[in-house]
């Protein structure tokens, strides 16, 4: 049947006799409650908005293909990497972090970089960003980050004071803040930025040998960024600039590609590493742990319906496949709970049945038979009348011990250990990053910082200047000048780092 031949029905299939005129008591009388189509349409409309993501609410997505280009089977027995040339269907979602669904794409912000690979061993979600580090390394601070970068509870406006008060209370945040204030703080669009798994993960091979890894995704389109002025001009005319760019590029066959790399660290190297190798505020230097090519992914198909595929896409780092595993990274450990929990709230307990989230390489009849019922259980007949318990005398649903992971290394007693006693090397890496910038790029960091700190109180500005100075004196002096603060009025060599536990006024 053509679109032109289709006739209007209600959601349960009943013919609709009149789409434009409500049922009333007389031509000018009140509406009748028996106008079923009107009631149905309004009640459906009243409920069609689902909760937005607490972070990463504004997003764009596309389907694509991952292809293995290099052999890494000595590190992992994950089937997705089993042979050169192997292809796996995937879905990618990119996002801003702080803004709501209607936020502008060209804001200065971190970009989410979430990938879902539909492998024959289940879905693998790699939930990353366009930066290799994060603002802090303990997940107990995550809720406060959300509060600081979003709207003030009194004014309901984004508040730079809240934002910078939080960031400058965490000296370890300077690395991420430096990236955010640099040229890469505003990618021109989603195609012209790198992506990172950010966390440390692990791989293991057929012999049960484990290595620690970090994932990198380098754009094949090249890096392109926007200045504050360019971004403001774009936002004034197109708040969906990045989404539009990605969609239109794919529609015309200009498919964007990224190359996947890993960095590898042995367990012995991790024991002797200068810093905590699982610290999300730090990178592994490439000269010590070089990038190893793995493959590439291409995005080549736009979703047919944004809500169905992009808004309902659910990513969680707990979705991991044999051959890959987690690490002691505290932030990763915290996300193992929070992401799945948030998706169950936002989309429901059976959100895995939504097509974009369904495991495509595993038959639906093989999905866990012990997870049953719940709202909107629709696609698998709720496992019918089959066995729903274990053990059972039918020999059904036995465990698969061949997929057991190698023992996970841990040490120490359970305790709330002070992270600052373990590692207070906050400023080495942001200092090195600053020194890698060209002179023009450094000046833009100073200017961008001053723009972002407009309206922030002097005590918070001074804390930030002090942290910048500790990373590199030129960094501190440049920020102070841009902020119009005499650097000689600041105690630059105080021994007490200004953390949320120990502010110096």
From Swiss-Prot:
Q: Name one GO cellular component term.
A: cytoplasm
- Biological process (GO) annotations? hydrogen peroxide catabolic process; response to hydrogen peroxide
- State where heme binds: 339
What does the UniProt keyword field contain? Answer: Heme, Hydrogen peroxide, Iron, Metal-binding, Oxidoreductase, Peroxidase
Q: Which domain of life is it from?
A: Bacteria
Gene Ontology molecular function: catalase activity; heme binding; metal ion binding
Q: What is its EC number?
A: 1.11.1.6
Cofactor field: heme
Q: What CDD domains does the entry give?
A: catalase_clade_3
Has UniProt tagged this entry with the keyword Iron? Answer: yes
Give a single Pfam family match: Catalase
Subunit structure comment from the entry: Homodimer.
Task: Report the function annotation for this chain.
Answer: Decomposes hydrogen peroxide into water and oxygen; serves to protect cells from the toxic effects of hydrogen peroxide.
Membership in a protein family: Belongs to the catalase family.
User: Can you say what this protein is called?
Assistant: Catalase
Q: What is the lineage of its organism?
A: Bacteria, Bacillati, Bacillota, Bacilli, Bacillales
